[in-house]
């Protein structure tokens, strides 16, 4: 989680809900999303299913299962085409942007529409709505992660958020709803014994990089 649940449901101007049916799987979050909609928050649902919240959505993109990466690339293609990226955030807080531009340049709305079985204009509208909203979190669940490309799907959504500067701010971020109680918290706090060694290596590597950067 990059943001607390209360923050993303009470402070968001738009919510992008991807591969998640919180009213059934996470009812407290589902209730909070409905409350956010009542106060005027926009909702984009990205899900092949006709979930309850899709009836309240401004846009419902019914992706073909397993095409989340292409969808995210298409969103980023539109953001760049429309000049809606956050250049300051990208320059100061990201790396590899030119490589990402090269990857997504061929994922036009028309191409993504064919891959994902969605309407190209709806994809454009969703991308522009997401980019222009001041505070817009992405909330996702197992509908993204339970694929062979689950990791890539999450990374692609993270790239989306960074492209428009929606990380590290109130009412934004990339936020997973998981399958068991506090499984995300355990991972975020490096308490998962399955990955403890890998996490330690990453922390050490980051420490070394920061030390070199600041001449320590």
Protein language model annotation of sequence segments:
Residues 1-181, 196, 200-216:
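Cofactor-pocket helix-loop regions in the catalytic cores of large enzyme subunits
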Residues 184:
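N-terminal beta-loop-helix "entrance" segment that forms/cooperates
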């Amino acid at each position: 989680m990059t943001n607390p649940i209360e923050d993303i449901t009470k402070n968001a101007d738009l919510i992008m809900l991807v591969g998640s049916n919180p009213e059934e799987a996470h009812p407290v979050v589902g209730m909070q999303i409905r409350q956010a909609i009542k106060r005027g928050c926009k909702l984009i649902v990205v899900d092949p299913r006709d979930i309850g919240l899709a009836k309240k959505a401004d846009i419902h993109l019914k992706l073909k299962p397993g095409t989340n990466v292409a969808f995210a690339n298409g969103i980023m293609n539109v953001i760049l085409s429309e000049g809606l990226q956050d250049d300051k955030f990208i320059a100061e807080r990201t790396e590899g942007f030119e490589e990402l531009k090269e990857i997504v340049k061929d994922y036009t709305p028309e191409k993504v529409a064919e891959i994902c079985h969605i309407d190209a204009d709806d994809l454009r509208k969703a991308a522009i709505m997401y980019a222009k909203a001041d505070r817009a979190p992405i909330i996702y669940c197992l509908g993204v992660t339970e694929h062979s490309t689950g990791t890539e799907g999450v990374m692609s959504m993270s790239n989306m958020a960074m492209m428009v500067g929606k990380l590290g701010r109130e009412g934004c971020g990339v936020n997973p709803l998981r399958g068991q109680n506090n499984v995300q918290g355990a991972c975020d706090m490096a308490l998962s014994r399955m990955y403890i060694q890998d996490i330690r290596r990453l922390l050490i590597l980051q420490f070394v990089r920061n030390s070199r950067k600041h001449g320590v």
